[in-house]
Amino acid sequence: MEILRIEPTPSPNTMKVVLSYTREDKLSNTYKKVEETQPRFINQLLSIDGITSIFHVMNFLAVDKAPKADWEVILPDIKAAFSDANKVLESVNEPQIDNHFGEIKAELLTFKGIPYQIKLTSADQELREQLPQTYVDHMTQAQTAHDNIVFMRKWLDLGNRYGNIEEVMDGVLEEVLATYPESQLPVLVKHALEENHATNNYHFYRHVSLDEYHATDNWKTRLRMLNHFPKPTFEDIPLLDLALSDEKVPVRRQAIVLLGMIESKEILPYLYKGLRDKSPAVRRTAGDCISDLGYPEALPEMVLLLDDPQKIVRWRAAMFIFDEGNAEQLPALKAHINDNAFEVKLQIEMAISRIENGDEALGSVWKQMANRTI
């Protein structure tokens, strides 16, 4: 059994190791600790410092590392684990990984729809911040004697952010306070005490017109409108296009998110505006939307992002080219083969290899990995 190649995945803490051997049982297993009943090579990999789990299915392994572990140290050890009996790839000697501008997951802790804490999680950090005391007080007012607080509290996914985690926290706090102003808290408490919250579903949607949005001079109100906007249609594009010119980054970012929900090639020009935004967070979000839509027509625009100053944006561009690219993108990929960010360089190498070998992109594999049972 040999390692054919090692590929990055959308998760910075997971690498895909493609093997020359395909499982005949068509089963999958997740391994988290060394056990005698497991395959020897699995135990060898689990013995490597920094590896936390291995998912084995078909002809590949999804290897997870600890957030603070370094792929530059782990990858040669993975290859060495196969070297006793197998031919392996030569160890790569990549530059130091820059973790200062990475992907950050933002979540909001709520009880009966009343927010009271923010949590940010990056590859190597977790940061929490409680909302002002009045939010905690109103959350307490919404409790009844029969409430199971632990069961009824809920983490709301606010999506991904990008940048320095302390600066991101400041921005997310500003967004949350704009979306849930103090003046709205008594209404939320009243609703919490009157309604049956067994479903724990508290998101309210309200459609606004272009005229109503345009007449609003408070950016917090505009953001609140977008955050409570239902799934948009083509008729909403003028409003969202206007929001792309907003002075506040959270408004522009949310406009991009909503545009991405209109699953049509016709919205690509508006997403391209996001790719040129002065905020890296907006550029990356636009790249994510384009990647989710998967239209090859966006390749020329995504190729331009290989020159973006932020690695998290360049990585998204390289990943999209890996998924959708063809021989036309090879010159641009080869021109950027020496990118100074490890993840970007590796993704560019894989895109070149896939295109030159004529291999198909395995988008369905990412879904299988994301949905695997841990």
From Swiss-Prot:
The keyword Protein biosynthesis does not apply. InterPro entries: ARM-like (IPR011989), ARM-type_fold (IPR016024), Nfu/NifU_N (IPR014824), Nfu/NifU_N_sf (IPR036498), PBS_lyase_HEAT (IPR004155), Virulence_F_dom (IPR025989). The keyword Membrane does not apply. It comes from the Bacteria. Keywords: Virulence. One of its GO terms (molecular function) is oxidoreductase activity. Required for hemolysin production. Belongs to the CvfC family. This is Conserved virulence factor C. It comes from Staphylococcus aureus (strain MSSA476). The lineage of its organism: Bacteria, Bacillati, Bacillota, Bacilli, Bacillales. The gene is cvfC.
